[in-house]
Swiss-Prot record:
Ca(2+) 2 binds at residues 31, 36, 82-84. GO terms for cellular component: nucleus; plasma membrane. The keyword Hydrolase does not apply. It comes from the Eukaryota. Residues 1-115 form the C2 domain. CDD domains: C2_ArfGAP. This is Protein C2-DOMAIN ABA-RELATED 6. Disruption phenotype: Increased sensitivity to blue light leading to an enhanced phototropic bending and a faster response to gravitropic stimulus. The gene is CAR6. Keywords: Abscisic acid signaling pathway, Calcium, Cell membrane, Developmental protein, GTPase activation, Lipid-binding, Membrane, Metal-binding, Nucleus. Stimulates the GTPase/ATPase activities of Obg-like ATPases. Mediates the transient calcium-dependent interaction of PYR/PYL/RCAR abscisic acid (ABA) receptors with the plasma membrane and thus regulates ABA sensitivity. Prevents hypocotyl bending as well as gravitropic response under blue light conditions.
């Protein structure tokens, strides 16, 4: 089956999103006393990994990972693992990052907004992994979204992240 022009265009680089993986909150223990957590973020074939924090169920990563957005409808998945030396890494939960509200606000092309201006508020639902309200705001000329994701497929744990759209001179934009 031949691809339409629209489908071919979707594979062009739309832009870049920086995901600041801030911290883990009350992550599950997978070793005797603690865990050695790290985060993996995937979108299509892209796979990004944070560094490992040793012996900590409340790790501070503060690590920036950058995804190239080719298809805005492609799901972004976040997985947390416990690093093990001699056996396979243990799963510590996962979440899906709903990029749609963030990308929709960016499409509006808002410029020169006052610092801290609330642009959109997203409430937790059964369809997203939000632990609490997530607010998209202007931040010194940038649009950012802070969110705390409730991990699924695990007994406890949350991960705090921040999304930021990065300017891409060669991208087609949204």
């Amino acid at each position: 089956m031949e691809k339409t022009e629209e489908e071919v265009e979707m594979k062009e680089l739309v832009g870049l999103v920086r995901i600041l993986v801030k911290r883990g909150i009350d992550l599950a223990r997978r070793d005797a006393l603690s865990s050695d957590p790290f985060v993996v973020i995937t979108m299509g074939p892209q796979k990004l990994k944070s560094f490992t924090v040793k012996n900590n169920c409340n790790p501070e990563w503060n690590e920036e990972l950058t995804l190239a957005i080719e298809d805005p409808n492609e799901p972004v998945k976040l997985m947390v693992y416990d690093k093990d030396t001699f056996t396979a890494d243990d799963k510590m939960g996962d979440a899906q990052i709903d990029m749609k509200p963030f990308l929709d606000v960016h499409k509006l092309g808002l410029k020169e907004l006052p610092h801290g201006k609330e642009l959109k508020r997203i409430v937790p639902t059964r369809d997203n992994c939000l632990s609490e309200d997530s607010i998209i705001v202007s931040d010194n000329g940038k649009i950012v979204q802070d969110m705390i994701l409730l991990l699924k497929n695990v007994e406890c744990g949350k991960v705090e992240i921040q999304l930021e759209w990065l300017k891409n001179p060669g991208g087609s934009g949204l």
